[in-house]
Every structure is written in structure tokens, then in C-alpha cells.
From Swiss-Prot:
Keyword annotations of the record: Cytolysis, Secreted
Gene Ontology process terms (BP): killing of cells of another organism
Isomerase is among the record's keywords: no
Source taxon at top rank: Eukaryota
The protein, known as: Cryptide Pep-9
Expression sites (tissue/organ): Expressed by the venom gland.
Subcellular location: Secreted
Record's function text: Presents moderate hemolytic activity at physiological concentrations (micromolar range), and weak lactate dehydrogenase (LDH) release from mast cells. Does not induce mast cell degranulation, and antimicrobial effects. In vivo, injection into mice causes moderate edema formation, but induces very weak or no change in nociceptive sensibility. It also causes an alteration in rearing (standing on hind limbs), but does not impact locomotion.
GO cellular component: extracellular region
UniProt lineage: Eukaryota, Metazoa, Ecdysozoa, Arthropoda, Chelicerata
């Protein structure tokens, strides 16, 4: 599954 960018 794609990883969501964390800011």
C-alpha cells in the first residue's frame, strides 16, 4: 500500500 507523506 502507498505510504502517505508525513510532514
Amino acid at each position: 500500500k502507498p505510504v502517505e507523506p508525513v510532514g
